[in-house]
Structures are given as structure tokens and as C-alpha cells.
């Protein structure tokens, strides 16, 4: 299974346009063979940042979507002024926790090991889903997870986000230098993602399509 971790910061004046574009993509996205789900979250620590998190059966499924005209047009609009900034990571799910049972996914072959991002400092991203009361702050959420930023153990960056359409559905986005130190709470589902590509608006060295970096 593959994950696309797409963090965006729409221009404040273009936020409604961003939502309109996102909504227009859903019908075709849902019909792509191998598409699993897409959920949007808003950051609790970085005002204006949105996470679009999608899961795909395999890399071919993701390629099917990336080569559609609809996706290409949305990219053009985003780059042409809707998005002030973005950070996109694509990776393979290497371990999952469901109902407190760990499932190690043995699908990372030698080619994929060689393809681990050379640009991004974080080679692993951990995604932990959990529930909080609606409107809970980031300190309360971090406390529930037992997350201690003072003891990073390879933790490069983290954020906690709340689902846009279902307040109270939270996700921890933790970027680790190598493998992750497990962060878990009872009843929480999590995925570990090995990052294969890492790029953004201002650094596109690992992007699959050529666009000149924004200046």
C-alpha cells in the first residue's frame, strides 16, 4: 500500500478556490482502480496548513491518477497561485497497527530500498489516528499520545491535525530520521510510511514530473 502525504498552505484569498478544486476531484478520484481513501486535516500548530492524506493499493494505482487530465489541471491551478506553499511526500506503508495488533508489511524490495528519499531528512513518517473531544488543543492531544518533544530519539518534526469534515478525528504526523520509536495509544490505528519521494513548491528534485521550482 502506498501513501501520499500532501501538506498545503492555500493563499488566504484562494482558500474557497482550493476547496472547490478539491471537491471537483473527488468523483474521478473515487473511480480510480486502486484508490482507497482520501481525508483532509487542518493543522493545530500551523495556521492555514491542510494535510490531504490518501492511500493507494499500489504504485500503479497512484500513476493512474497522476496521469489523468483532471489531476494535471488541478496541479496547474495550484502552482499558478492557489497554493502559497506545499510539501508532498510519497511512500510505501511498511507497518500498520489495527485494533492494537501490529502488521509488518514485507513488501519493500531492494529497488525500493535504494529509492528511499535522498532529499528529505525524514526517511519514515508515522501516522497515528486517535479521538479527542471536538476543539481540543494541540497540548491536550500531545499529552494523550504521551509525546515528549524533549526526547526526540530521531524525531525531526511533528504536528497534530484534526479532520476537516469530522472534528474530533485526529492524526499525529511524525517525521523520523530513520525508523520510528513507536507512539501508540489504546484504540489508535497507525501506519509507518517509508518515504520514497519528498518535494515541494521550491524544491522539486524528486518530483515525478518536471516543473521549474518556484522562486
Curated annotation (Swiss-Prot):
List the Pfam families hit by this protein, alphabetically: ABM
Chief subcellular location: endoplasmic reticulum
SUPFAM superfamilies linked to this entry: Dimeric alpha+beta barrel
Name the domain of life: Eukaryota
Q: Which Gene3D superfamilies match?
A: 3.30.70.100
**Keyword flag Secreted:** yes
The record's keywords, sorted A to Z, are: Endoplasmic reticulum, Oxidoreductase, Secreted, Virulence
Which reactions is this enzyme annotated as catalysing? jasmonate + NADPH + O2 + H(+) = (1R,2R)-12-hydroxyjasmonate + NADP(+) + H2O
GO function terms (MF aspect): oxidoreductase activity
Deletion phenotype, per the entry, is: Fails to develop blast disease on the rice host but does not affect vegetative growth, asexual development and appressorium formation. Significantly reduces the host penetration ability. Leads to the accumulation of a methylated form of jasmonate (MeJA) resulting in a strong induction of the host defense response in an otherwise susceptible rice plant. Does not affect the ability to cause blast disease in barley.
Instruction: Tell me which EC number(s) this protein carries.
Output: 1.14.13.228
CC terms in the record's Gene Ontology section: endoplasmic reticulum; extracellular region
**Compartments in which it is found:** Endoplasmic reticulum; Secreted
Record domain ABM: where = 2-90
Which class of enzymes does this protein belong to? oxidoreductase
Q: What task does this protein carry out?
A: Monooxygenase that converts the endogenous (and likely the host) jasmonate (JA) to its hydroxylated derivative 12-hydroxyjasmonate (12OH-JA), also known as tuberonic acid, a compound that attenuates or disables jasmonate-based host innate immunity and which is essential for proper initiation and elaboration of the blast disease in rice.
The protein depicted here goes by the name: Jasmonate monooxygenase ABM
What is this organism's lineage? Eukaryota, Fungi, Dikarya, Ascomycota, Pezizomycotina
**What is this protein's gene name?**
ABM
Amino acid at each position: 500500500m502506498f501513501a501520499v502525504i500532501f501538506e498545503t498552505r492555500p493563499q488566504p484569498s484562494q482558500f474557497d478556490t482550493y476547496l472547490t478544486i478539491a471537491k471537483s476531484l473527488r468523483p474521478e478520484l473515487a473511480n480510480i482502480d486502486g484508490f482507497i481513501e482520501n481525508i483532509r486535516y487542518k493543522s493545530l500548530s500551523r495556521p492555514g496548513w491542510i494535510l490531504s492524506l490518501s492511500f493507494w493499493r499500489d504504485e500503479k494505482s497512484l500513476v493512474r491518477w497522476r496521469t489523468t487530465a483532471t489531476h494535471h489541471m488541478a496541479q496547474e491551478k495550484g502552482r499558478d497561485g492557489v497554493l502559497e506553499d506545499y510539501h508532498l511526500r510519497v511512500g510505501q506503508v511498511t507497518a500498520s497497527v489495527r485494533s492494537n495488533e501490529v502488521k509488518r508489511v514485507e513488501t519493500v524490495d531492494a529497488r525500493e530500498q535504494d529509492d528511499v528519499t535522498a532529499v528529505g531528512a525524514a526517511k519514515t513518517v508515522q501516522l497515528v489516528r486517535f479521538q479527542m473531544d471536538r476543539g481540543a488543543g494541540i497540548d491536550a492531544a500531545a499529552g494523550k499520545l504521551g509525546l515528549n518533544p524533549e526526547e526526540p530519539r530521531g524525531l525531526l518534526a511533528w504536528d497534530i491535525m484534526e479532520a476537516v469534515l469530522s472534528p474530533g478525528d485526529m492524526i499525529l504526523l511524525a517525521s523520523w530520521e530513520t525508523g520510528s520509536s513507536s507512539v501508540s495509544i489504546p484504540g489508535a490505528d497507525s501506519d509507518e510510511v517509508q518515504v520514497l519521494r519528498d518535494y515541494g513548491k521550491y524544491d522539486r528534485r524528486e518530483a515525478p514530473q518536471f516543473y521549474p521550482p518556484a522562486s
